[in-house]
Amino acid sequence: MVLSPADKSNVKAAWGKVGGHAGEYGAEALERMFLSFPTTKTYFPHFDLSHGSAQVKGHGKKVADALTLAVGHVDDMPNALSALSDLHAHKLRVDPVNFKLLSHCLLVTLAAHLPAEFTPAVHASLDKFLASVSTVLTSKYR
């Protein structure tokens, strides 16, 4: 999915508003995903998935850091996320549908925390951005 200049601007501005809360929002999105889509828990059998667990917070920070990297390299996400794509495709073997589920939960989390900034245009841009990230992360599954 191609991001327009307006989409890129919206994504960078919205992610800039996330600021120091990125890890917190990443963890919240994971918790939402685990509650809304319980089958996603199967990829984390060794995690304490209870609310506020250190493992969920730690993985939420990893998710947020990867998204920060993608925002910073929005014009070259395939190269920036190559190692992460390899990891998910070849080692973790995560079902690609789970990226869509997490993307949805991220959008809900961002909308809850940034209601003034979460305009329809920003929502659409973030949705396109997360779809692009998902496409990159699943590109090595073939």
Swiss-Prot record:
Keyword Acetylation part of the UniProt annotation: yes
Residues recorded with modification Phosphothreonine: T109, T135, T138
All residue ranges annotated as the Globin domain in the record: 2-142
UniProt xrefs under Gene3D superfamilies: Globins
Modified residues (N6-acetyllysine): K17
Modified residues (N6-succinyllysine): K8, K12, K17, K41
Residues modified as Phosphoserine: S4, S36, S50, S103, S125, S132, S139
Annotated residues for binding of heme b: H88
One Pfam family hit: Globin
Residues modified as Phosphotyrosine: Y25
InterPro entries with a match to the protein in the record: Globin, Globin-like_sf, Globin/Proto, Hemoglobin_a-typ, Hemoglobin_oxygen_transport, Hemoglobin_pi
Tree of life domain: Eukaryota
Molecular function GO labels: haptoglobin binding; heme binding; iron ion binding; organic acid binding; oxygen binding; oxygen carrier activity; peroxidase activity
GO cellular component term of the entry, any: hemoglobin complex
PROSITE patterns assigned to the protein according to its UniProt record, in alphabetical order: GLOBIN (PS01033)
GO biological process: hydrogen peroxide catabolic process
Family from the record: Belongs to the globin family.
Functional summary from the UniProt entry: Involved in oxygen transport from the lung to the various peripheral tissues.
Quaternary assembly: Heterotetramer of two alpha chains and two beta chains.
Name the UniProt record assigns to this protein: Hemoglobin subunit alpha
